[in-house]
């Protein structure tokens, strides 16, 4: 069976990006049940494995995240990013944080960039690519350290920095600040 790899297969990348964007859209409150809508469209168009399984698994994982956020009434993009991290959805966290990073400036921009890079480091690590993961983790630590005050929504930022230095696997769970 073909392996799903968004880094080398166009269809995999398109599906991952569409589903991730749907999750971000739903988290930003722009459209309810959008993950189900987008997943359904892809399932109608894609008949082969591993795409179908990936779409179904993503739909289930995203549903769990959305239920978790709703049941606990977690508000705000930054807090949603913490939840995505804790669910191991590093690519999706990166996508969500980019929605506020693009409009930020100065040290806040550096801080958000550091978190985006930290998520990217774990995307690479989980893909079995330790060299790019280490490089990205190094840049993440640098950006986070110079702007820590903008990341007060993370209660264990020092632990995250330590784990990025060691590139700990599994990554630490983030605490809400």
Q: What role is predicted for each listed range?
A:
Residues 126-148:
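TPR/TPR-like (Sel1-like) alpha-helical repeat modules
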Residues 88, 112-116:
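Aromatic- and histidine-enriched alpha-helix N-cap/loop-to-helix transition segments
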Residues 73-74, 106, 110-113:
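Residues that mark the junctions of alpha-helical repeat units in TPR/alpha-solenoid scaffolds
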Residues 1-92, 96-103, 146-177:
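N-terminal alpha-helical interaction modules that lie
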